[in-house]
Amino acid sequence: MKILVTGATGFIGAAVARRLSQQGHEVLGLSRSGAAAAKLRAAGLTPIVGDFANPASLFEPATQVDAVVSTASIGQVEGTPESFAKDRDAVQVMSEALGDSGKPLIFTSGSAIFGVFTKG
């Protein structure tokens, strides 16, 4: 399968992309910079241009694959309502791109949704 992994240079996304590649899938990693593209190429992945901060940029890449695994987020641990809205919009755009194709969109989440915890 040809699979797009968003967040493929991050902790979870890199592990997912690596495992999919090891299983023989063609993995495309979302890249918003030259440095990220180089990191993806070094890992044996194909970089594809897109940015969660610009959800419309994700439509075309999502139409070119058999599945999407979304592990990216522009929100940080202390995300803002705006960053969470961009994340939501990005996933929605990819979902719309897949439409009624029957191709899966797998959405993951991170611990940031729980906010910042301190010991005590």
What are the language-model segments listed below?
Residues 31-96:
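NAD(P)H-binding glycine-rich loop region in Rossmannoid oxidoreductase-like domains
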Residues 2, 26, 46, 104:
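Residues at the starts of beta-strands that form the adenosine-phosphate
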Residues 23, 63-64, 100-101:
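Residue-level preference for short coil/turn positions at secondary-structure junctions
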Residues 21, 41, 99:
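Anion (oxyanion) recognition and catalysis
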Residues 15, 39, 79-81, 115-119:
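Short glycine-/acidic-enriched loop or helix-start segments at secondary-structure transitions
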Residues 6, 66-71, 107-108:
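Rossmann-fold scaffold of SDR-type NAD(P)-dependent oxidoreductases
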Residues 3-25:
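N-terminal Rossmann NAD(P)H-binding glycine-rich loop of SDR-like oxidoreductase domains
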Residues 28, 74, 89-120:
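Conserved Rossmann-fold NAD(P)-dependent oxidoreductase catalytic core, especially the SDR/UDP-sugar
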